[in-house]
Amino acid sequence: MRQLHIVRSADDHLAWDVVRRQVLAGDEVRVVLTGAAASAEPPLGSQGIPMPDLRYDELVELLAWCERVVSW
């Protein structure tokens, strides 16, 4: 299983696209969200927020929810 660290940044859409491609390719993934990377300090939540292992339909729902979120 791959563990993907998704960093909140200006390139969020690229990170989520990587997740989508890996899931569509049949990879099992564990998504870990981390804080903003644009800081000189360690990102907020630098340990990441481990998400449970997601089925494809659950990941699609998570992605749709994240895309609606204006700020985290």
Regions found by a protein language model. Give the residues of each.
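N-terminal beta-loop-helix "entrance" segment that forms/cooperates
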Residues: 36-51
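Short internal beta-strands
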Residues: 27-37
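Glycine-rich, highly charged phosphate/nucleotide-binding loops
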Residues: 47-63
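Short, charged, surface-exposed secondary-structure boundary motifs
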Residues: 15, 40-42, 57-60
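An anion/phosphate-binding loop that grips the pyrophosphate of nucleotide cofactors and donors
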Residues: 66
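Short, glycine-rich nucleotide/cofactor-binding loops
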Residues: 2-16
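A short, Lys/Arg-enriched amphipathic alpha-helix followed by its capping loop at the start of a domain
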Residues: 18-27
